[in-house]
UniProtKB/Swiss-Prot annotation:
This is Protein ShdD. InterPro entries: VdcD-like. Involved in the non-oxidative decarboxylation and detoxification of phenolic derivatives under anaerobic conditions, however the precise biochemical function of ShdD in metabolism of phenolic acid is unknown. It is not known, if phenolic acid decarboxylase forms a complex composed of ShdB, ShdC and ShdD. The term subunit is often used in reference to the operon, however there is no experimental evidence to prove the existence of the complex.
Amino acid sequence: MKCHRCGSDNVRKMVDSPVGDAWEVYVCEKCCYSWRSTENPVVMEKFKLDDNKIANMGVIPPIPPLKK
């Protein structure tokens, strides 16, 4: 199986449906894209990633604590 966003073969099943075999969720270990087996994942060309884009991605800042 290949990632629909970056084309990597490094994809793993993250979780199974809690009810029967309704669906599975897969995640790409390279770009963190995830999708359900029941979805038809379509990634628009401008959102696809390559090695250069992944290497230059910014770091996502942590979520600050809630104010009391």
